[in-house]
Amino acid sequence: DHFQYGLGEIHISLNLDYLQINLLSEHHCPDSLQNLWILEKGGFDLDYVLECISYYKYTNYNKKLREKYLIRADKGIERLTYIIKDLDMITRLEAGDLSLNIETFDIIKLIESVFDLLEMKAAAKKIALSFDIDYKNPVLVKGDKERLQQVVSNLVVNSIKYGDINGTTEVSVENLIKNKVIVRITDNGEGIEKKHIPRLFERFYRVDKSGSRKEGGSGLGLAIVKHIIEAHNEKIIIQSELGKGSQFSFTLQKSEEIDS
């Protein structure tokens, strides 16, 4: 696979016979070091993958051992791919290079589709995904449907990631003012200390200073959410209490009818 982003390029080749990672920089050594720094900052343990590759080279005589280290390296590369794609998106968002495809759609159906996609992930932690009420009628909004699905998905994933076993993630959609609705995603998980809240939308910022990797992710999800919402000229708000849970809310423009 081949990925390109602001600081240079990364080429990844992987099969049962060889694994190769090449970091190519437009400005040679300094930017190459910067590339590695960004990946480490994102919680990606490059040393771990390189160690797996190194062991792989010396295990030609043992097929099972080779496969073990190949699987480990493959997981690291999968995470690296995730980070690179998110870096590319956030760079484009910050530069204003990502155009929005504005259309009218039913936000309730969009949320339902996110629930369907994340049902198994939530079930693994016995977390219930639900609406606050039974929405019998569509709630029409205007925006980039694909990008806003990413917003809802990132926020629901976040609530699952930091939710408690047997917890809940509840979504509500309410009228705010005449031409606005507010979408609230509320969980009863571990919550966030107030001192961390102002920095949650920063790239790679983690409340857990150990940079826990067991939950995966790129560390860019909330930064992407903020940029997408702001690209729509809308607002996102966080309310949280440590030990009680969190609520992420964002506004959207209402629409009266489906685009013809």
PLM regions and their residue ranges:
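Short helix-loop "hinge" at the ATP-lid/N-box region of the Bergerat-fold HATPase_c
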Residues: S159-I160
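Conserved glycine-rich
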Residues: N233-E234
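Conserved micro-motifs of the catalytic ATP-binding
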Residues: Y61, L65, A95-L100, P138-G143
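Short alpha-helical segment of the dimerization/phosphotransfer core of two-component systems
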Residues: K75-L80
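Short conserved segment of the HATPase_c
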Residues: I192-F204
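A conserved beta-strand-to-alpha-helix junction within the catalytic ATP-binding
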Residues: N101-D116, S130
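Short conserved segments within the C-terminal catalytic ATPase subdomain
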Residues: K121-F131
